[in-house]
Amino acid sequence: MKLELTPRQRKILWATVRSYIATAEPVGSKTLAQSYNFGVSTATIRNDLATLEQVGLLFQPHTSAGRVPSDFGYRVYVNDLLTSANSGGIPHDAPQPDPHPALQQLMDQLGRELGDDLDSLLQRVAQLLAHLSGCIALITPPQGPVVAIHHVQLVSVAPGRVMVLVVTDSYQTHSALVSPPDWPSDSREDLEDELQLLSNFLTLKLRGKTFAELQDLSWLKLDEEFRTYGHWLQQLLRSVVQRCLQPSLGQVFSAGMAELMRQPEFSQARQVQAVMQLIEEGAKQLQGMIGLHFADGGDPQLAYLPPLPSSTEMDQESGQSARKTPVIIYIGSENPLESLHHCTVIASTYHRRSAPLGTVTLLGPTRMAYERSIAAVQAVASHLTRALA
């Protein structure tokens, strides 16, 4: 059934949603009449509220209370928010989202410090994102077969122990401890020189290859000077794959549980426990759900792809249009995970060469500041995409 609302009813829906987001209190006709200039009586507003309730956009938690948005009401609000079709019916006197100067500052820092410690920086981004939104922030680092090797370095750290450091082209650093090879007798005194020679050789041979490709490399045909190391190199690569590739697959940087617990919707221990269990045990399931949606196209009504920018919004470096990052928004019962039916999930992916590298996610109550949250998720994903290009 097609939803048909009058312009005033749509304005009243918007005002109700925004008032409830701001106060967490049921909204009545008197509050709306005092806060917004609809140009009609409270009785007319009350009738429109009743109509919005009849079509499932609002409901009354108690008989004598005002109205609060349903999941469907939030969905209509968000769809209107993200399209220009209803811009004429939007109450512009409603509260507008505040800018995020702190987030912008950290994103600028991301571009400057990317090569230093990406994991630490992503954790700080998650913490700031959680603080600004009042939600839980989840960020997965670059991972998967599209992450390629950029540099390999072998370092002697103790007698009989060598550390192999692998730097990827997404600026992550992985390490593994291995036993040194059976050095030729004339090379034992020049251990550092020999390790540097092997480091240069490995960097030359492995640069641009993915971790998944390491398992299939053959070291049977090597230059004369490295032939004696063939078996050791095979073992070294096996250690790198086991130690460096596998742990990153489920890694999630998270922050914001304290912020979430301040929300009135999570005042009950049962609701907090469900989310804590998800973060501790099921974060990979949530991230997999998001990644699968983007990979398969997902439900069109859940996704948002902003329109192409005008010529003034071109990327200054590449000269190409900087289309905003698509987002996926699950509201309440839309969530595939039943434990999140009282939550909203806003997520996006960041990419390199059109291949998804990781996800940026906010998890909070359905009573969420959608404008700010969507803008923040898009900003982080877009900056990561540009920084890792």
From Swiss-Prot:
It comes from the Bacteria. One of its GO terms (biological process) is negative regulation of DNA-templated transcription. Gene3D superfamilies: 3.30.450.40, Heat-inducible transcription repressor hrca homolog, domain 3 (3.30.390.60), Winged helix-like DNA-binding domain superfamily/Winged helix DNA-binding domain (1.10.10.10). One of its GO terms (molecular function) is DNA binding. Keywords: Repressor, Stress response, Transcription, Transcription regulation. Pfam families: HrcA, HTH_DeoR. InterPro entries: DeoR_HTH, GAF-like_dom_sf, HrcA, HrcA_C, WH-like_DNA-bd_sf, WH_DNA-bd_sf, WHTH_transcript_rep_HrcA_IDD. Negative regulator of class I heat shock genes (grpE-dnaK-dnaJ and groELS operons). Prevents heat-shock induction of these operons. Belongs to the HrcA family. This is Heat-inducible transcription repressor HrcA.
